[in-house]
Amino acid sequence: MTTKSMMKPKPTNTISRPLPAWLRFYLYGMQGLLDEIVFTALFDHIFEPQGNAMLKGYSTIFSFFLYGSCSFFVERVYVFLYLKHGLRWYLRFPLYLCILYTWEFTFGLILRQFDACSWDYSHYPLNLMGLITLVYAPGWLVLCVYQDILAHFLLSLRITTEVHHHDLMGSKLD
């Protein structure tokens, strides 16, 4: 045993707590921002007539708040429907999809009032006021699967703190 390891106080207790809500919101927002940039780059590369050979994706800072708040809300739905009541994925995902479309439509409508809405789906079929389109439904369903995985992971993370005996008793220097 080395002198350093002998001098290091041994932990007497470990305190563990879940990730705080603000941190999960932040992580959902950052993940959503990244997802949108990747999605727009790939979607334009594959489906737009002019293509997107450079794979340039785009988004807006407002998307951070849109995805952060929506994912945080869907996380609470996941906790209630799945963790508390065991509702199967094929029953949860249609509800998630309705929540996503409602959230995007509402955010878009509010942002449009300030000329700040960065998306316009009017050129796609099955759109509502250019704010949402069913063309994206398959992509949203994939994100519903990912949302469950991410929510489960983030809810399982714990922040642990070691409490040492000398911290509890107060360290005395003689």
Residue ranges and their predicted role:
Residues T2-D174:
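Aromatic-rich, lipid-facing transmembrane alpha helices and their immediate juxtamembrane interface loops
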